[in-house]
A protein has these predicted regions:
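Conserved short alpha-helical segments that host acidic/polar catalytic motifs at enzyme active sites
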Residues: 1-261
């Protein structure tokens, strides 16, 4: 996030999903900030949580499994976002990720992205939602409603194991604008998708330990100290989809169109 600081300074947010959590314990967490230095604010608060835990268990860092049970933002799936406000106010409520909660893990969704949609009214009409004042001011709110609508439908067919490819193929054809979106599901599945024109950038890197995606190739290269050819471009209209076991695939969701970026 710090290496892409230039992409947005109006706010920042994090969402975390933990895998293999005992029933009844929280597995989806979110923190957002619109402080003057939002990235620093987020990680200062997380650092405070660690320091507070160390007061009572000084050797806690030697036991990562135990730490995971005590710290909200220690987990396997992380979604970070930097806000550059193009729509809506700069209140913290407009900072990504947005989340939808449900009793079933597979219907919990955290969503963030780099985009500007021009047909939010049409999106709400598509799924029969009457938007409130807040939703009318946020294109992410419209996108979230559509994606979650089709996620719930897919979950009905495959409880807690929705086919993300089908979700995206149903949800994204009516998105009018450039976008790269990232989503985490409460069951440990995740995705990144890029618009058919390639208006917004997206890159990814995969090794034996991590699967990472970002808006800038350089941010991935410098963070993981890898060569330019090791970081791949996510092509227009495609999605990188990952399950809770780390299995991944690249799927064509939309037919690619004339490149605009």
């Amino acid at each position: 996030m710090e290496k892409q600081h230039n992409r947005g300074q109006d706010g920042a947010g994090l969402a975390m999903v933990k895998l293999n959590i005992e029933p009844g314990n929280p597995y989806l967490h979110r923190m957002r900030s619109n402080a003057p230095q939002p990235i620093a604010d987020l990680f200062f608060k997380i650092g405070q949580e660690i320091q507070e835990l160390e007061k009572y268990q000084p050797d806690i860092k030697q036991h990562p499994g135990l730490m995971k049970g005590h710290l909200p933002f220690l987990g396997e799936l992380l979604l970070g976002h930097l806000r550059y406000g193009t729509q809506g106010k700069n209140n913290v409520e407009f900072c990504h990720p947005f989340i939808k909660r449900d009793l079933m893990p597979g219907k919990n969704l955290a969503l963030a992205g780099n985009f500007n949609l021009v047909n939010t009214d049409e999106l709400f009409e598509q799924i029969g939602v009457n938007p409130g004042d807040f939703q009318k001011q946020s294109d992410l709110a419209a996108m979230m409603e559509v994606v979650h609508h089709y996620l719930v439908k897919e979950d009905e067919a495959n409880p807690n194991n929705a086919n993300i490819t089908n979700v995206l193929k149903n949800a994204t054809p009516i998105f009018d604008g450039g976008y790269t979106i990232g989503g985490l599901l409460g069951n440990g599945h995740s995705f990144i998708m890029r618009d058919a024109h390639g208006i917004r950038p997206a890159y990814y890197y995969i090794n034996d330990e991590v699967i990472v995606a970002a808006s800038e190739r350089a941010a991935i290269r410098t963070t993981f100290n890898v060569g330019e050819n090791e970081v791949q471009e996510l092509m227009p209209g495609t999605a990188l989809i990952v399950d809770d076991l780390g299995n991944y695939r690249i799927e064509k969701i939309l037919e690619p169109k004339e490149r605009r970026a």
